[in-house]
């Protein structure tokens, strides 16, 4: 099995609870099929910041060699999501087995745009959670606002 050409670890990645990877040839766009990508770019994402954690460059290999896919999957072990242009169904399932969700996106989708969407979703989710936590009486009010119109005895 030929080794990975290069791997650059930028920061200690254990402090990042969310790591996402991008199949990219130019560091800026998602533009590659997962099985053929020459590079995976991995970012750590938090609600308030994003940091490049790792870049993994692969040897260009044609075909569907098992080792080629295994190296790419291994490079994603600590990631939660992979963004790519395309991925085979069998490899998609293999990624799910190691806890990585693959997302297909249109060619030339910007990595910055996807990172911003992830942060926005994270922020919105946090805001909704905070609103629920601030209103402990919400269920009581909901029950008072709505009447029960169902038959209390379903056997009738």
Swiss-Prot record:
Keywords: Nitrogen fixation
Gene Ontology process terms (BP): nitrogen fixation
CDD domains linked to this entry: NifX (cd00853)
Source organism, top-level taxon: Bacteria
Gene3D superfamilies in the record: Dinitrogenase iron-molybdenum cofactor biosynthesis domain
PANTHER family linked to this entry: IRON-MOLIBDENUM COFACTOR PROCESSING PROTEIN, IRON-MOLYBDENUM PROTEIN-RELATED-RELATED
Family: Belongs to the NifX/NifY family.
Protein name, UniProt field: Protein NifX
Source organism per UniProt: Klebsiella pneumoniae
């Amino acid at each position: 099995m030929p080794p990975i050409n290069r791997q650059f670890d930028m920061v200690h990645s254990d402090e990042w609870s969310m790591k996402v990877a991008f199949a990219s040839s130019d560091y800026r766009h998602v533009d590659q099929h997962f099985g053929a990508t020459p590079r995976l770019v991995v970012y750590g994402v938090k609600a308030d910041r994003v940091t490049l954690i790792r870049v993994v460059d692969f040897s260009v290999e044609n075909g569907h060699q098992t080792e080629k896919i295994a190296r790419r999957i291994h490079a994603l072990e600590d990631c939660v999501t992979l963004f790519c242009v395309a991925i085979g169904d069998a490899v998609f399932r293999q990624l799910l087995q190691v806890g990585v969700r693959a997302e297909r996106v249109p060619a030339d989708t910007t990595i910055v745009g996807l990172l911003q969407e992830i942060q926005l979703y994270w922020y919105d989710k946090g805001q909704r959670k905070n609103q629920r936590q601030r209103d402990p009486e919400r269920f009581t009010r909901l029950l008072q606002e709505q009447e029960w119109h169902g038959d209390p005895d379903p056997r009738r």
